Amino acid sequence: MKIATYNINGINGRLDNLLRWLKEAEPDVVCLQELKCEDSRFPETALLDAGYHAIWQGQKSWNGVAILSRYGEIKETRRGLDGDEQDMHSRYIEAFING
């Protein structure tokens, strides 16, 4: 299994680069940081067309994280870290991937 992490620094502005890299590197699982997009603007269709299922927690400006997988549907198991109920930043997402 090939797992990669990628600080995308704005997913919509770098979507072409991401799609090209996914095709070339063929990672099985990718963790993205700094999406810098709201949930409604996440490019789910483009990623599905590239063969990757995704879960994400978007946020305008600095934050936002996502997990991509070639193994089909991803089951989210946690969103955010315990211990700070006031933390509204999209910095952490956890999932189960069957693969």
Where in this protein do the model-derived segments appear?
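N-terminal, active-site-proximal structural segment of metallo-dependent hydrolase catalytic domains
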Residues: 1-49, 53-56, 65
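Structured beta-strand-rich core segments of catalytic domains in phosphoester-bond hydrolases
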Residues: 35-38, 44-99
